[in-house]
């Protein structure tokens, strides 16, 4: 311990003799900040769902991208009945069930309400969904969909493509709004696109958000970036421009142009 005062005195002496330019260089090295911090903070691969979560962290977002990974639509060993009875179907699960129905409805048919009920029951009979899940499906909204302008467009379309997966390279700044010029790989699934009788490509995304008439702008603002990414991916894949893109609002039972 007796040596400590001598050591401190020596260190103090050396510190006083440090050149100013050496001190400045030392500060630069100690407090150096990487100039491309956005690049290392940005993932090289992401999904449209993740992008939406960043923009709307409090929103329950449902799309066919999530549907493709849902375990409840894959055959598994049946759970005990008492467990199934205790489970409740969440709003997100209800949205996923509606997406599943839209995917499987036959656009060449003119469904009656009774036929829609039979369609849902058939999903149960084929073990695609459970009885409890079928009870959570809004039959009226499915029927409204088959009477919508969109449904009539699909009936007359040259081609109809559902649940189309895609990958696309985009600039990080276009996705996250940061300063990075790096490319990131974005993956997702397009709910629906079709080619109409005029040869135009129409892009559609189903949304189950609860909104009122007159609040369509909320959906447009919330999902415009998502559909912009879908449009870029589709145009890159088909080498042809998308003529129009729509949100189909399940709640309102109509298409909303973006």
Regions from the PLM with identified roles:
Residues 1-258:
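Structural signature of nuclease core domains in nucleic-acid processing machines
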């Amino acid at each position: 311990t007796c040596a400590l005062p001598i050591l401190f005195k020596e260190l103090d002496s050396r510190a006083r003799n440090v050149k100013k330019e050496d001190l400045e260089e030392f500060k630069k090295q100690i407090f150096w900040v990487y100039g491309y911090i956005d690049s290392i903070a940005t993932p090289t691969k992401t999904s449209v769902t993740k992008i939406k979560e960043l923009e709307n962290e409090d929103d329950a977002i449902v799309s066919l991208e999530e549907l493709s990974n849902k375990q409840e639509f894959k055959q598994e060993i049946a759970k005990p009945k008492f467990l199934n009875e205790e489970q409740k179907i969440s709003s997100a699960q209800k949205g996923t069930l509606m997406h599943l129905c839209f995917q499987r409805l036959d656009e060449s048919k003119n469904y009656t309400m009774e036929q829609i009920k039979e369609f849902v029951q058939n999903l149960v009979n084929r073990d695609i969904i459970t009885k409890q899940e079928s009870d959570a499906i809004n039959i009226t909204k499915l029927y409204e969909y088959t009477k919508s302008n969109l449904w009539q467009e699909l009936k007359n379309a040259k081609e109809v493509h559902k649940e189309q997966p895609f990958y696309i390279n985009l600039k990080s700044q276009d996705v996250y709004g940061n300063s990075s010029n790096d490319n990131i790989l974005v993956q997702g699934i397009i709910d629906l696109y079709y080619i109409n009788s005029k040869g135009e490509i129409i892009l559609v995304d189903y949304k189950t958000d609860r909104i009122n008439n007159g609040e369509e702008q909320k959906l447009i603002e919330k999902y415009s970036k998502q559909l912009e990414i879908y449009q870029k991916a589709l145009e890159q894949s088909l080498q042809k421009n998308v003529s129009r893109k729509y949100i189909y609002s399940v709640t309102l039972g109509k298409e909303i142009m973006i």
